[in-house]
């Protein structure tokens, strides 16, 4: 039987392999400790999170941990260009699954502030979102996800402006991504933090469950590749990244 590939820690990359039953609870505890330390050091903490279904269980584990949530600012890594009240809004998902229980006191920084249509054009939304992120301050913890296609945030392979969004010399905080066609499961224009902004975080976490994404992760582990955007996060040496992998 062929041996299953398994990543190993290296440089600024740390691999935590835990059971699928405990991953979200253990990662939530790690995040909460980092936020509490930031509050102790600076008087506030910034948590930047991704949307989609993958982080829901993590959010629900995190929201019941006792820290001073009134001093936590929650920002978004990316957003669909829909009103913040829309069922597919990442902000709404965060409000529903994270900003409940003890975490209800946290402050959510919207990427798309509008509550109804029509919204400004995506480039204008990205510009406003970038200003809001800068006002919120540096993320102490930034939670990424990875799709089976290797995308992270709204940095999708095939986007016509992907190389610009991944360029560390790019001074934009957020960008409107040009996706043709848009993702089938959520066919909306997207705005996203650029790679440079993502890497400005003090600590990045990437939780992965299941084995279906391991082949993509293995490719990303080897070298930076525009076809696998998450590879640019894994290949850099600027920012600590913790991969939380369910065994």
What spans do the regions from the language model cover?
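N-terminal glycine-/serine-/threonine-rich phosphate-binding loop
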Residues: 1-47
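Class I SAM-dependent methyltransferase SAM-binding "motif I" and its flanking Rossmann-like core
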Residues: 148-196
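Glycine-rich beta-strand-to-loop/alpha-helix junction loops that act as flexible
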Residues: 49-54, 144-148, 209
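A glycine- and small-aliphatic-rich helix-loop capping segment at beta-alpha/alpha-beta transitions
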Residues: 61-69, 92-96, 157-166
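Short, conserved loop/helix-junction motifs that constitute active-site signature segments
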Residues: 65-73, 102-103, 167-168, 196-201, ...
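Ligand-binding beta-strand-loop-alpha-helix segment within the catalytic cores
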Residues: 2-11, 70-143
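Glycine-rich N-terminal segment of FAD-binding domains in flavoprotein oxidoreductases
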Residues: 39, 43-63
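ATP/nucleoside-binding phosphotransfer catalytic cores, i.e., glycine-rich phosphate-binding loops
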Residues: 2, 194-196, 200-247
